[in-house]
């Protein structure tokens, strides 16, 4: 029982951390504070008492700080060797660093939180990395009537400052160390998205450093206002993905439809607490039929309870199935128990999950947990769950949007991959996460995020530490994904059942004809019909293709 309890605890943490697959630093908070003025777009707009005196700092090979900055990357499969890492403290310093790199003919990219799953930053061709980690201020900007978040902030900082200062939050991810830069520009999905949409749906403006046709960098402020001549740049950064158009040094957040100037009313309210129900099955309890029934139950519930405005959007759930030998199957659901009816919702959800599943799970329900503490400190990092030191963590993640659940044939395939004794490494998994609700109330063209009728997000991941295992570890997750989506060319093409993949789960295999044999290119899988507009914006805003990576938007 001690081992079962330990496993249930670590797997429950992974249920939350899976969204990041993705320590609170000094931030600025307080009540309705005096806002930082917003000067001309080209001026330095950073908070002086956080950034004055810092930067720019250039760290090159041979500097003792250089290895630390390279290790900010999440995935040890990739390690860059740039000529310099430029630590910056202001927008003007970013402009300067970009200008220097472009003038020298050096490929430049940006790092925020460091959680990119592919080698978009840690690419051997990248010669200059602009590191935004010292630009992390969070404050209310009365001039913009919105909350400003600098591009180097991480989610835990944002949640803490918004909650302690104004009692509001954003519907972002549950891995606290994820950076806002990639997260928001890729859409920004999290536990509260069924209630409040994606973070990109709550994005009012961005400040972006772009490079013109003459190779000159400058900063531009782009808002969602219909009469803003730079609105296209806002739209592209509301889900178009990071590393495509420029470097975002600041985001301004305000919920659509919010009115007035009271900052406590301009973003979603912080939940009153969190109550979590956890159901755990060991693999010894689940044969193929029971596993198929359980996962089908999860999909059916989401098909029936994910429409915009549905009461059940108060509940968010995950199902994590980890390979035999390391864990089992855990279903985790959470609500705000201070909302009337939600505790009964948890009970009803648990009954729906266990229907016709012969084996009874180990079940537990927490009391009312503090929202901020639980959100920022209790989500387990993947490395800790699997016992892999973070310095050695190597991974591969593949994803899919689902409008409907899986077929029995697909689930038999998943079961075989998760339980077959022919594969002995135990840290592979499938994860399913609640989607829909408020997200699906927006048009596919409101922002650059086109996926507006799915009810679940699925992920298939593998984690390991030894570089010598690379080939077989990649083969396992690649073949699992290919076989699950075998009837559609090995990928989740947009159709009546699946709807492509989440931009923040980049997968270069989608651009490889060896693994994507469908007629849908990677750009359709990620962007659907919005890709053509993104290409137009790319051509206009980054005509020299300064900002690019393996899956970046291509100019016309």
Where on the chain are the PLM-derived regions?
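Glycine-rich N-terminal segment of FAD-binding domains in flavoprotein oxidoreductases
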Residues: 63, 74-135
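N-terminal secretory signal peptides and thylakoid transit peptides that target proteins
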Residues: 1-17
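Cofactor-binding catalytic cores of oxidoreductases
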Residues: 39, 43-74, 113, 118-121, ...
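FAD-binding subdomain of flavoenzyme oxidoreductases
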Residues: 172, 177-281
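Glycine-/small-residue-rich beta-strand-loop submotif within the FAD-binding core of flavoenzymes
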Residues: 76, 92, 122-150, 191, ...
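C-terminal region of N-terminal signal peptides and the immediate post-cleavage residues
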Residues: 21-41
